[in-house]
Amino acid sequence: MLLWSAVRGLSPPRIVPSLLVVVALAGLLPGLRSHGLQLSPTDSTTPDSQPSRERSIGDVTTAPPEVTPESRPVNRSVTEHGMKPRKAFPVLGIDYTHVRTPFEISLWILLACLMKIGFHVIPTISSIVPESCLLIVVGLLVGGLIKGVGEKPPFLQSEVFFLFLLPPIILDAGYFLPLRQFTENLGTILIFAVVGTLWNAFFLGGLMYAVCLVGGEQINNIGLLDNLLFGSIISAVDPVAVLAVFEEIHINELLHILVFGESLLNDAVTVVLYHLFEEFANYDHVGIVDIVLGFLSFFVVALGGVFVGVVYGVIAAFTSRFTAHIRVIEPLFVFLYSYMAYLSAELFHLSGIMALIASGVVMRPYVEANISHKSHTTIKYFLKMWSSVSETLIFIFLGVSTVAGSHHWNWTFVISTLLFCLIARVLGVLGLTWFINKFRIVKLTPKDQFIIAYGGLRGAIAFSLGYLLDKKHFPMCDLFLTAIITVIFFTVFVQGMTIRPLVDLLAVKKKQETKRSINEEIHTQFLDHLLTGIEDICGHYGHHHWKDKLNRFNKKYVKKCLIAGERSKEPQLIAFYHKMEMKQAIELVESGGMGKIPSAVSTVSMQNIHPKALPAERILPALSKDKEEEIRKILRNNLQKTRQRLRSYNRHTLVADPYEEAWNQMLLRRQKARQLEQKINNYLTVPAHKLDSPTMSRARIGSDPLAYEPKADLPVITIDPASPQSPESVDLVNEELKGKVLGLSREPRVAEEAAEEDEDGGIVMRPKEPSSPGTDDVFSPAPSDSPSSQRMQRCLSDPGPHPEPGEGEPFIPKGQ
């Protein structure tokens, strides 16, 4: 009745996922039997016995009489030739053992997918309880159900976790890592990951050793190395648990990258400490040399993993150069090379997580420049799908393994572990933050410190490392595993469920849902270049300086080797523009924005009487987040650098410095040529025949040849560039027009008539030898204040281009 009332209370959209879950659970039960599918008792017969059959005689069906061995007819042909009696052809057969493993794997994946659908169908539950908690509860229920029917629940094997479930999650996090935020906070992340993990391991291990000494007879035999090994396992922050919780609360980028980056980079410390204490536990005596070698192994494991990842990332980027004609296999290279990097690192006992992160970060910019847009979409969705399914299976198997595993409970040890984990985390974050804030420009506030300390969640990595312990060398491994599961459940359930209300209560800044505008991106890039220039001036080589060095090295050498064709040379903005135009055209055709074209040849189309389509309103496609992100990336990579701009500015400069960039010269020449043409048209009223005159590339200086031969009907004007500010330096060849032109300030109409009277002759102004005017003569105002006079003075006072060295004399002699 309770089940029926619960089903009646669900709406139709919610009943379907529930029924699918029940079907999946029902399918799991027969698959988990250790001996395969059991047949009915009638089917399990001995080879000598024959099944009872009925004989049909006419319309009457009779049962065969009981046949004794003496009365059984003998088939002489069989006995003579030694052949067995022929069996009937099997119409339907059952062989579950043949498909057992893939069938059970498919059922578990199906259960994980149905769980994710069911959680989002009921939004009230998912808004209160994190998804990771619900998945663990489902695992507990499934494990209890399997154990209740008398079967042994499956256990999360460490090899399955480290080789198949963990790599997709780390690859997804490394491939789509926010590189800018990660590099800007790399120092803080390394301090939390390395120093913080070491502090937690030794602090927790030392306190637990003290607890074991006074805790009683059950835990007195646990030594110091065993407790240090246990502390190294339980001290590491789990990236899977952090991703599952922090992505739901939408915390700001700084806190997210600090906690998540710590969970990624502390893998090297955890691996080194785990193998170090595991080896030391087998030694009778540990010397100083062993401790020094263990310290050096940390750098080997961390840097070796990074090196392996970089090598495979470069190989993947280089391979993608040659996939232009085989686009189908492009996503496969990303997955294979990344997974090979992880396996190669694990082969040499290096950090596989560091190798995956390094390979994803290195290969992404070059692979995306070589592959097609469809391949990029495939990589994105496949990684998200793969990591989501792996994360779901990990939490479900955590619950199932809790029911299936053997546990040893000790109140003193378990409660002390939980309490000291919280104390070590809080003290470590407070102490390290006090030191870090002395060097950070943006300080970590007390609210930020609380979220960082409260977000240190433990997960499946600690569980798998605890499961790997050998009972021969560590007899109390069941107690360790029980304490680890307790800490995992407390951090996931208690801290994971309460972190969202605490974030709202403390008013911690959350992540902005809207992307930054293009204007903000341009200003951010401008400030980066500005800070780089300031660092160069001050002589301080900060991260902006080294970032600029790496970008220059990347553009000059690396891109030419790893990016195919002209894509390494031409700006990505142009290629992206053509891509956007193509997408827009396709969207317009699909949306009906263009006239329909007949799909088949017909007489109507041949007669050209096809009715014209009505002018449909143009549908402007909305700018998606992916397109906007591509625009931002292109702007970040292709904005003009500050050092490549003009070295100096002068308002009298018409021709650019010949040592400047070619395109800067072109822009300056065109701009100054347009300004000069505008001045001539405005001041001298010379008709501009743009159709007959070629475009001026630059201003003519000194004795340069004319850009084109002047026409006969145009007045010829020659201006002395040496002393353009002196009206006496202009000599008119036609003496009759001299007085009329000089009297332009008094009678403009007379000057116009004079120009009309002598159109054939034109006006010729020849330079005279400049005199040596005084300061008062140079800066004295004109005698007339009429508009025409002022316009003439502005024309004659235009300095024009600077003359070449040796042409003309200086305006003011050196003696004055």
From Swiss-Prot:
Q: Which residue ranges does the record annotate as region Interaction with TESC?
A: 503-545, 633-816
UniProt feature, compositional bias: Polar residues: 37-50, 783-792
> Residue positions of the PTM Phosphoserine?
599, 602, 605, 648, 693, 697, 703, 723, 726, 729, 786, 788, 797
Give a GO biological-process term.
regulation of the force of heart contraction by cardiac conduction
Membrane topology reported for the UniProt record: Multi-pass membrane protein
Q: Supply one GO CC term from the record.
A: cytoplasm
Give TM segment ranges: 99-121, 131-148, 159-176, 187-215, 223-249, 253-283, 288-322, 329-341, 351-371, 374-404, 411-438, 445-469, 476-505
Q: What else is known?
A: Predicted models used for more than 20 years predicted 10-12 transmembrane segments. More recently, the structure of SLC9A1 has been solved and reveals that SLC9A1 possesses 13 transmembrane regions.
The protein here is known as: Sodium/hydrogen exchanger 1
